[in-house]
Amino acid sequence: LIALIYQTNLMRLEQQLTREAELKSKMPYVMIANKNYGGPNYAITLFNKGLGPAIIDSFSITTEDTTYQMDLATYFFEVIPGVAEINSLFYSNLLPGQLVPAGEEIDLISIDNSQEPTNALLRLMENSPDIDYQLIYRSVYDERWVLTGEAFFPVKLED
């Protein structure tokens, strides 16, 4: 009887360790960063440096007194005056349910090979209120993380 109880506990521990290994092998690791700041190929880029895909749940931007339930590109075009007039500006939207594969990079805002539009965008950003963003995403196993502009690393959300 003691051997049976020991064997059952051992099997349960093995299943738990296997499950934890599966979760880690599919974990997304999302970051948002500037690329080539101030240069002619400037971009604000979302990276998935994890081993598994990330599924976007929500994106919000907060200023001193307002929270906007919108992605970065929409915020730039709808809230920051003058952004829509910048030539050579490209953007990608982040939508709930969007899948970001492991190893993928998405330029949320980018300017290709043009210094003058880069300078114009950076001036508009510097003259705008400071923002913080919150990106909530999940793994294929429905583990959820939050990434904010104040943190360097995503934080796992408890259920």
Which ranges hold each PLM region?
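Membrane-proximal alpha-helical anchors
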Residues: 1-73, 81-82
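An amphipathic alpha-helical interaction surface
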Residues: 39-41, 55-159
